Swiss-Prot record:
This is RUN domain-containing protein 3B. The gene is RUNDC3B. Interacts with RAP2A. Residues 293-341 form a coiled coil. SUPFAM superfamilies: RUN domain-like. Belongs to the RUNDC3 family. It comes from Bos taurus. Residues 7-19 have a biased composition (Gly residues). InterPro entries: Run_dom, Run_dom_sf, RUN_RUNDC3B, RUNDC3A_B. The keyword Metal-binding does not apply.
Length: 423
């Protein structure tokens, strides 16, 4: 009997250990899921708030996000002396005081970040380590969160630290968020914060490492009443109303909506900010439209002026072309007249040499007639400047003498022939 009772006691102890282990696993899963979900909501509220105002230390959305991220990075962080030996093996100075029994001051996620993020190019680890007014490890971790957000490299830091799985295993226990599947979701969530311009002051009480970070869950809680609960509330309202008058029954009376005054004030403030932003955008667009209309009118006026100049230049070119064509025709006519006069003068000179003096007088008469004709022909005023070389006396004499020499060759032979000898 005693052995049986002892065996039953041992079995109950074994069953209790299994229940405790399953309960611990369930609690760890709930913690991870809660922190990741709240972190996602916090990032969304930060992005929404950044559309209306600058995010700084006074923003409640940022303070809540910083507390959530600190809780995530501190989830199941080891406190054993093995991590201390690992840090001393890497020749990394320990944060806080080290006693004969191990690590003195409480650990924080900064001890993990400064080891796992050493491979990030142009990291801020050394600058944060050298801060004079930031002494504790937790305060340096909070300063690192702010600097990484201002540098828009927080997602890069977290991704680099999570890829160093060996270092992560050294610092965190099983069931930690950074060791689970939620770690990849965390890096993706933080990537959206690169679009926000943060402005922080690293000298203040907000970096005090003595006070732990507390998450405010109220902004992310929303109660949705089920349909069964709504119907039961309606029945209860009907029952309460029937005490006054059994005939009066409310028609589908819904549950009363109770809104907090602060939530209404915040919504009104957001709507007002959106309205002001819309008005500013409208004014900017109206000014831009007016500027573009002025530029368009100026361009149209310049286009008209250029078209008028093109038409004037085309007309001037046409007139000049017609004038040049007329001058060419006049030059051709004068050239033909000069050629006919040269031919007549050559014939007259030939006839003078071949005929007797009486006939030469007739030739002189013909020459006088030709001279009178040439004198009677008036020069065109438009050709005086262009034909100066043709109207000069020297050129005219040289031209006539040249042509007369050409024509004198054949008549001399005719004069020596017997048929042309004078009787």
């Amino acid at each position: 009997m005693a052995s049986r009772s002892l065996g039953g006691l041992g079995g109950s102890r074994g069953g209790g250990g299994g229940v405790k282990k399953s309960l611990s696993a369930r609690n760890a899963a709930v913690e991870r899921r809660n922190l990741i979900t709240v972190c996602r909501f916090s990032v969304k509220t930060l992005i929404d708030r950044s559309c209306f105002e600058t995010i700084d230390d006074s923003s409640p959305e940022f303070n809540n996000f910083a507390a959530i991220l600190e809780q995530i990075l501190s989830h199941r962080l080891k406190e054993s002396s093995q991590s201390c030996r690992w840090l001393s093996h890497l020749q990394i100075p320990l944060q806080g005081q080290v006693t004969w029994f191990g690590y003195g001051s409480p650990r924080s996620f900064w001890d993990y970040i400064r080891v796992a993020c050493r491979k990030v190019s142009q990291n801020c680890i050394c600058s944060i380590e050298n801060m004079e007014h930031v002494s504790s490890s937790r305060a340096k971790g909070r300063a690192w969160i702010r600097v990484a957000l201002m540098e828009k490299h927080l997602s890069e830091y977290i991704s680099t630290a999570l890829r160093d799985f060996k270092t992560t295993r050294r610092f965190y226990e099983d069931g930690a968020i950074v060791l689970g599947e939620e770690a990849n979701m965390l890096a993706g969530m933080l990537l959206g914060l690169n679009a926000i311009d943060f402005s922080f002051c690293l000298k203040g009480e907000r970096l005090d490492g003595n006070l732990p970070a507390v998450i405010d869950y109220i902004p992310y809680l929303r109660f949705t009443q089920s349909s069964d609960s709504i119907s039961s509330d309606e029945e209860e309202l009907r029952t309460l109303g029937s005490s006054d008058s059994e005939s009066s029954t409310p028609e589908k009376a819904g549950p009363p909506v109770i809104m907090d005054e602060n939530s209404w004030f915040n919504k009104c403030k957001r709507v007002k900010q959106k309205y002001q932003l819309t008005l500013e955008q409208k004014g900017y667009l109206e000014e831009l439209l007016q500027l573009r209309e002025n530029q368009l009118s100026e361009s149209v006026a310049q286009n008209k002026i250029l078209l008028q100049r093109i038409e004037d230049s085309d007309l001037a070119h046409k007139l000049e072309k017609e004038q040049l064509e007329y001058i060419i025709v006049e030059l051709q006519d004068q050239l033909k007249s000069y050629q006919s006069l040269d031919q007549l003068s050559a014939e007259v000179s030939l006839s003078q040499t071949s005929l007797d003096p009486g006939q030469s007088q007739e030739g002189d008469g013909k020459q006088d007639t030709l001279n009178l004709i040439s004198e009677g022909k008036e020069d065109t005023p438009s050709l005086l400047g262009l034909c100066g070389s043709l109207t000069s006396v020297a050129s005219y004499k040289s031209l006539t003498s040249l042509k007369s020499n050409d024509y004198l060759a054949s008549p001399t032979t005719e004069m020596t022939s017997p048929g042309l000898t004078p009787s």
